[in-house]
């Protein structure tokens, strides 16, 4: 009875162990591949719990999401014979799920060692062998990442389709200490030179700013002077126009006044000519004699009152001449002398 219990216990233990080894779990972002007797099975499984034949079947979980493979301490010899070392090179890659079986079959589940690690060593040595230390360490260092990525992806496209390289990151290589100090000194001198150049640019910029400021001030003064000069010219032109208008008005007034006086004189002359009739002249003659306070007696006095046609005509002409020139108000003096 005791032996039967022992057998049952052993059988139960074996069954539990078999069941435990048969049940396995695949994480999210992974694909399970199976081996039976060392041979890779064509079946794969996705995330979750799965069963397999215990003891004779084994599995490996292959990651299909983004992963970073680190290649450390990669030696590299330059064309000048200087040996340098890259401390760490990071390769970001992912595996397409439907390509898992083919890649694991051809390169095992540790495909990254054959396809990535070895390729990194090869490409870096190829790159360093055709470039100098100056180019690798300074001039072309920023191109190493992209060159490695392109070279890896080009080979993987033909050798292992489905393995995609997303990025490659390369750290600064370690160089011999003496050379490193020389580079540091060179970088220090270059930095000083850049600082001096920047200071010179700042000084030139300040001088240019001052020059532009002075130019703006000069233009401002010139514009103000031009505006002031224009105002003065406009004032002078306005004064000139006002003077011309005043002169024209004065000339027009004087001309109108002269024309009026001339017209008045002409009208007075015409009126006087119309008044110089013989009767009017005779009347004026009598008035002049009557108003004269001095009368000289002689033999010619009686003739003064004679209505002689010849004498009256001459006297009328003389009187008309006097009256025509505004002398109608002068007293007429008559004097007779004894011969």
Curated annotation (Swiss-Prot):
One of its GO terms (biological process) is SREBP signaling pathway. Pfam families: Band_7. The modification N6-acetyllysine is found at residue 267. Residues 25-339 are extracellular. CDD domains: SPFH_like_u3 (cd03406). It is found in: Endoplasmic reticulum membrane. Residues 177-309 are annotated as: Interaction with ERLIN1. One of its GO terms (cellular component) is protein-containing complex. Deubiquitinated by USP25; leading to stabilization. Its main location: endoplasmic reticulum. GO terms for molecular function: cholesterol binding; ubiquitin protein ligase binding. Keywords: Acetylation, Cholesterol metabolism, Endoplasmic reticulum, Glycoprotein, Lipid metabolism, Membrane, Signal-anchor, Steroid metabolism, Sterol metabolism, Transmembrane, Transmembrane helix. It comes from the Eukaryota. Residues 1-3 are cytoplasmic. The keyword Transmembrane helix applies. It is a single-pass type II membrane protein. Glycans are attached at residue 106. The chain crosses the membrane at residues 4-24. PANTHER family: ERLIN (ER LIPID RAFT ASSOCIATED PROTEIN) HOMOLOG (PTHR15351), ERLIN-2 (PTHR15351:SF4). Forms a heteromeric complex with ERLIN1. In complex with ERLIN1, interacts with RNF170. Interacts with activated ITPR1, independently of the degree of ITPR1 polyubiquitination. Interacts with SCAP, INSIG1, SREBF1 and SREBF2 under cholesterol sufficiency conditions; indicative for an association with the SCAP-SREBP-INSIG complex. Probably part of an AMFR/gp78 and INSIG1-containing ubiquitin ligase complex involved in ERAD of HMGCR. Interacts with TMUB1; TMUB1 bridges the association with AMFR. Interacts with SYVN1 and RNF139. Interacts with TMEM259. Interacts with TMEM41B. Component of the ERLIN1/ERLIN2 complex which mediates the endoplasmic reticulum-associated degradation (ERAD) of inositol 1,4,5-trisphosphate receptors (IP3Rs) such as ITPR1. Promotes sterol-accelerated ERAD of HMGCR probably implicating an AMFR/gp78-containing ubiquitin ligase complex. Involved in regulation of cellular cholesterol homeostasis by regulation the SREBP signaling pathway. May promote ER retention of the SCAP-SREBF complex. Belongs to the band 7/mec-2 family. This is Erlin-2. It comes from Rattus norvegicus.
